[in-house]
């Protein structure tokens, strides 16, 4: 069982957590535990205890993983790292977005009077981020010279790769980027009163060019984001 000072770090794919796992192995001993088909790797980054896990793609996988981190490992905060598509013309491939909050852009019960994105029964449409953890990521980005943006992250079980879908999400939520896990992680953290932060490196423009850009820049963006997380976590000690 980890302590409340431990940070859970979630990536959806191997490429998003590979550098983190390598760094942990270089820092010292690691311990791996399997739950629900996921491998939870306990170790340290710098002097901070962490649990790193690949959750798999999508909202259900992300939510399941987050709840396991909180319930079984007792983490005190959760940091989601990975890649995303840009929804803002000023945010380029290779830039980083540190979330201010996160929304589920697929949720739509508007026919029953709810705002688009609002889950019936939920006390908020957008799930807030922990400012201390988010600022640590921003500060690390400034120190290593990464172009960083703050703003809303939109999540849903859909790879956004068309101008029409991009415009729909931007118009409804004024989000900076889109991906497939962050809002689910933030939702679980919100319900559990667990601090949360999301950082995403841009791999594509979430438009008609995404099918070309994403395979080209996926690994580069994921590595870039993981480096930033290592710097941020190391600064917390």
Q: At which residue positions do the language-model features occur?
A:
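Glycine-rich phosphate- or other oxyanion-binding loops that anchor nucleotides, phosphorylated ligands
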Residues: 3-7, 31-237
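Short, conserved "active-site rim" segments that organize catalytic pockets and cofactor/ligand binding
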Residues: 4-28
């Amino acid at each position: 069982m980890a302590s409340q000072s431990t940070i859970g770090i979630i990536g959806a794919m191997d490429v998003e957590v590979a550098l983190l796992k390598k760094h942990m192995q270089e820092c010292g001993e690691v311990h791996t535990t399997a739950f629900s088909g996921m491998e939870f790797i306990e170790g340290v980054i710098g002097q901070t205890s962490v649990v790193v896990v690949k959750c798999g793609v999508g909202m259900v996988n992300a939510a399941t993983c987050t709840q396991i981190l909180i319930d079984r490992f007792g983490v005190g905060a959760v940091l989601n790292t990975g890649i995303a598509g840009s929804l803002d013309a000023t945010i380029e491939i290779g830039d980083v977005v540190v979330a201010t909050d996160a929304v589920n852009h697929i949720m739509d019960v508007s026919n029953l009077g709810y705002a688009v994105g609002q889950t019936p029964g939920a006390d908020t449409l957008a799930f807030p981020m922990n400012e201390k953890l988010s600022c640590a990521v921003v500060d690390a980005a400034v120190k290593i010279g990464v172009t960083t943006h703050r703003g809303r992250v939109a999540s849903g079980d859909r790879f956004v790769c068309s101008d029409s879908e991009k415009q729909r999400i931007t118009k409804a939520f004024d989000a900076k980027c889109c991906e497939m896990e962050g809002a689910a992680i933030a939702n679980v953290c919100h319900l559990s009163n667990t601090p949360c932060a999301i950082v995403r490196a841009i791999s594509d423009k979430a438009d008609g060019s995404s099918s070309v850009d994403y395979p080209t820049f996926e690994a580069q963006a994921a590595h870039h984001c993981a480096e930033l997380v290592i710097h941020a976590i190391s600064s917390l000690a």
